[in-house]
Amino acid sequence: MNLKEKKLISKTLYSGKIISLNLDEVELPNGKKAYREYVRHSGGASVLLVDNGKILLVKQFRYAYNKEIYEIPAGKLNVNEDPKIAAARELEEETGYRAELVHIASIYPTPGYTDEIIHIYLAEKFEFVGQRLDEGEFLNCHFI
């Protein structure tokens, strides 16, 4: 059975700096119509850095959760940006580490409602060169 849905009408409900929210009318494989709400996002890149069996994590406040959470270093891609370049930039800005990066996976974190893809890299041959946080970015680094 063909599982593809055919887009009939597409409408952008909101367009912001980081995301846009869309509402599409689609034709389902059985010929019936349905609506799909989804978020468009440029994607992200993240880096897994392991030193002596400990993973480097960043801890920062995330407004959507209203609490501090641990994450691997990551950031959003600029439009048409090479994910490896974004990963290297984010690793150095957030943690102060520079490394050789090896792509290990690309994942679809929430495919039910966004087109975001996150590219994950493994840091090898890393060295500390100094943290350079973006304006308005506040975080702490921890090996756990």
Locate each region found by the language model:
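Beta-rich strand-turn-strand
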Residues: 81-86, 94-100
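Conserved Nudix-box catalytic region and its N-terminal flanking loop in Nudix hydrolases
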Residues: 2, 41, 45-89, 134-139
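Acidic, metal-coordinating catalytic segment for phosphate/diphosphate chemistry
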Residues: 5, 9-46, 51
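Short, solvent-exposed loop/turn elements at beta->coil junctions and helix N-caps
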Residues: 10-12, 105-110
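Nudix hydrolase/Nudix homology domain
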Residues: 1-5, 9-10, 17, 32, ...
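A short coil-to-beta-strand element that immediately follows conserved catalytic motifs
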Residues: 6, 98-104
